[in-house]
């Protein structure tokens, strides 16, 4: 049976463009209460201090609230039980970018990323060196673990370290904990692929296991900012960095619009979905179709991939698309503080490409 998926564009328009009285405007991934609060704080802060202040305040809200335990401290520990943070902030005016990845023992990842933008000529700082940079700026060093994360690790180890992110090692990572040793490469592995690539995309994305807030801000001057904050994949190999802090992967913005992504970051970062969605909007594609194209080009290679993209263009139109998630919610906020949460059905592995060739447009 054929299934069709609708991409909603429910937003106040006047003669095809958004009413300027609605600006600033913010769109964020995920529809839970913490994300709604972050969305409202972002639009309020944008009115007070501009698009970058609004972006950072919104992301920082989710960090403090530990949104769905997938943002901020006390979530998604690595194999060693340590929680590390990633964040990205982008200002479309001048393409200014700051990011941190694998940030240890500092809670304020988004503010540190903003510090990279404002106080260095770099784009991305990583690991312990990023922590030292944060301390130079006056950020407090503290343990990001909680009793809950410690219990997760304990349970994970008693369940033979399942799931994990190892492959082609011994003992069998699908049934045993490490330490692991690499298996000898066969001839076919050397010349073709270490594993069937479809096995690389099986990271289940859901409400408590999605790892990211992605946000796009459009200010009163119609200029965009965009960013992310994340504590990464749960039980990841220490040192792992996903899509969230990578410009064009986790988020992207220019004068034509902005986009943000969430989901299986190890796969998504290979396709730069946020950059792709924005460039599609630059070519005149509506946000819903731009997000849809960004998702389906990943599904063509990784049918089991799960994730989502939200997008907003310079006319104030919004759109979203998702794959292999039961339901994906996202928020839109306006100048008056109203936050509207939408929920869309997602493309599925078994039928996403066979029948549906393009998103259904509204408005």
From Swiss-Prot:
Oligomer and partners: Heterotetramer of two alpha and two beta chains arranged as a dimer of alpha/beta heterodimers.
UniProt protein name: Putative N(4)-(beta-N-acetylglucosaminyl)-L-asparaginase
Protein family membership: Belongs to the Ntn-hydrolase family.
Protein function: Cleaves the GlcNAc-Asn bond which joins oligosaccharides to the peptide of asparagine-linked glycoproteins.
Molecular function per GO: N4-(beta-N-acetylglucosaminyl)-L-asparaginase activity; peptidase activity
UniProt: substrate binding residues: 240-243, 262-265
Cystine connections: 161-177, 322-346
Listed Pfam families: Asparaginase_2
InterPro entries, per the entry: Ntn_hydrolases_N, Peptidase_T2
Glycan attachment sites: 15, 118, 196, 336
GO CC annotations, alphabetized: cytoplasm; lysosome
Signal sequence bounds: 1-17
UniProt keyword terms in alphabetical order: Autocatalytic cleavage, Disulfide bond, Glycoprotein, Hydrolase, Lysosome, Protease, Signal
Organism whose genome encodes this protein: Caenorhabditis elegans
Highest taxon in the source lineage: Eukaryota
Active site: 212 (nucleophile)
Top-rank EC class of the record's enzyme: hydrolase
Major localisation: other
